[in-house]
Amino acid sequence: MDLFHPAKGTLWKHELHQSGVELNKKDYFNPAMEAEFGVIINRDINPELASFDYILESVQSIYPLIEIHNLVFNGDAPNGAELLANNSIHSGVILGPENKVPNSNEITDLKLVYNNELVDKWIDKKWPFDMLGEIDWLVKDKAKTNNIFNSK
């Protein structure tokens, strides 16, 4: 992809699905899936106060999730710029079950299995560091355009 920083996209309401939903493959273009972690925050995050600890205190709950992409690239590799231009997320998210914030330094694995085949995995990820490591970047990046990372 040739990206040297985190990517961001917009998740529209109609693209947010709950666990157990049945989606039609015909509604997507060459669908691909990734295992991810998502968080819901309990307050708006003031970019001037943003720090790792401030963000950690702002987490209400954690979700394993499936990120759905339309795996279509029209240009030549590397495709990072095209990925960003097409909104990164592309096609939606399926939220798994809600998890409360665990104790610090908890190690976890996340695996996405589809049709009995391992599609994606995260191994030995440490809470909160591996899951929240890029949120500070996102908060400050959104602040450049006067967008506040909010809890709504």
Segments from the language model and where they lie:
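A conserved acidic, glycine/proline-rich C-terminal tail/linker
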Residues: 131-152
